[in-house]
Amino acid sequence: MVFRIASSPYTHNQRQTSRIMLLVLLAAVPGIAAQLWFFGWGTLVQILLASVSALLAEALVLKLRKQSVAATLKDNSALLTGLLLAVSIPPLAPWWMVVLGTVFAVIIAKQLYGGLGQNPFNPAMIGYVVLLISFPVQMTSWLPPHEIAVNIPGFIDAIQVIFSGHTASGGDMNTLRLGIDGISQATPLDTFKTSVRAGHSVEQIMQYPIYSGILAGAGWQWVNLAWLAGGVWLLWQKAIRWHIPLSFLVTLALCAMLGWLFSPETLAAPQIHLLSGATMLGAFFILTDPVTASTTNRGRLIFGALAGLLVWLIRSFGGYPDGVAFAVLLANITVPLIDYYTRPRVYGHRKG
């Protein structure tokens, strides 16, 4: 009889990294479908560009480091990084922007630290922030949802705008961004912040076409609900834990409610915060990154709550309309400290 001697751990989780990443990619399908429906084919083009760029960038670095290219690419982490960045940027952003952001995310924010499992910051959000700071105009040029859009670009038009800046008929981004009221549209969060600073009342702002949705912003409410559906499926599959999404959303809702009660003329209502921007995408797909989030249950609650507070502060008082990316990166910085003070006590040892 032959006995096999193996080192610990002796109990293994059968779900490999590649399977977890694949589950997250599958869970993103409802959110992607919603963005395609409300914002057009540009989202699909950006996803394809980001995916190819992520795989090529990762393969190049692995080749230079003389590591197995095929084995590493099979973990699907590069694909997920590209996907998260692609759905975070405007659908008709120039092609070179998503390529630049993805390459930066994979090479600088991930591989430079040693690859998957070593990076302290979420790579997709690093790429997003680099693009936002470097090209703020292009990164905030979102199309109006098709419900209130005048010009809805088709698949060919989307490709032409992304690669040349113009449609076949000569239309550009300024034309495509016009809403049914003839005014260039922005996201619900951007519209609210800009209008408040211009001295408009909340009652006036809520009459804008972008807020014609049942719950929050037109189109955006359904996009967020679609990402929420994908997130709930991830929880059901036990691919992520509930601590971070719950604490993030509860904290954001509480802060928004308190702010709205104390200053209803300058601060957005809770439903605007919860169902606009990247709220649900951030709660279930970005903050839950196991590499850059806290590793203890108490730590996850603190981590999520901190991110929720930061999102509300940035949206309400900062210079950017949506603070999810900045909140994620700032929360990432605190992870070592959070884990240090929330680590479980070793059995048989006194606390401290």
Curated annotation (Swiss-Prot):
Keywords: Cell inner membrane, Cell membrane, Electron transport, Flavoprotein, FMN, Membrane, Phosphoprotein, Translocase, Transmembrane, Transmembrane helix, Transport
Organism placement in taxonomy: Bacteria, Pseudomonadati, Pseudomonadota, Gammaproteobacteria, Enterobacterales
Molecular function per GO: oxidoreductase activity, acting on NAD(P)H
Quaternary structure note: The complex is composed of six subunits: RsxA, RsxB, RsxC, RsxD, RsxE and RsxG.
Broad class of the protein's primary localization: membrane
Keyword flag S-adenosyl-L-methionine: no
Organism in which the protein naturally occurs: Escherichia coli (strain K12)
Protein name, as recorded: Ion-translocating oxidoreductase complex subunit D
Role description: Part of a membrane-bound complex that couples electron transfer with translocation of ions across the membrane. Required to maintain the reduced state of SoxR. Probably transfers electron from NAD(P)H to SoxR.
Cofactor entry: FMN
Membrane topology note: Multi-pass membrane protein
